[in-house]
Amino acid sequence: MRVVGFHLMPWTEVEHAVAWPFSDDEFDPEIGHELYEDYLGQLELCEDVGFDMVGVNEHHYSSYGLMPSPNLMASRLIDRTDDITIGIMGNILPLRGHPVRVAEELSMLDTMSDGRICSGFVRG
C-alpha cells in the first residue's frame, strides 16, 4: 500500500461558505504568505512521517484551494523535500496553452527533482 498526503490549502479568512468565483478583494498578501508557508510545511512533513507521495492540484478563484499553479507548488516542494514523490494531481490542460509547454515544464520539474514527479491531468 502507498500513502499520499494532500492538502487543498484553503483560504481560512472567510466567515461563511462562499460561492465560486471567490473574489480576490478578500485576499490579504501577508496572510496568504503565512498560509503558503504553513501549508508547504505541512506537505513537507509528509516526507518526515513516511508518506510515499505528496500531492498538489489546481484550483482557480476558490476559497477552498490556494493553488492556481500546481507546477509552482511542486517546484517549491522539490526544494523543501529530499526523497518523496511529488504528485501533480492535475494541470488543467485547456488553461495551460500549448501542451508542449506543459510537457516541457513537467520534464524540467522531473529533472530538477531527480525523477520524483508523478503527473496527471484533469479536464477542467
Where are these regions (language model features)?
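Glycine-rich "substrate-gating" loop/helix at the edge of Rossmann-like oxidoreductase active sites
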Residues: S63-L66, N91-G97
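A short, small-residue-rich loop immediately preceding and capping a beta-strand
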Residues: I84-G90, C118
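Active-site beta-loop-alpha junctions enriched in small/polar residues
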Residues: L8-P10, H59, N91-L93, V122-G124
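Conserved beta-strand positions in the central sheet of alpha/beta enzyme cores
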Residues: G55, C118-G120
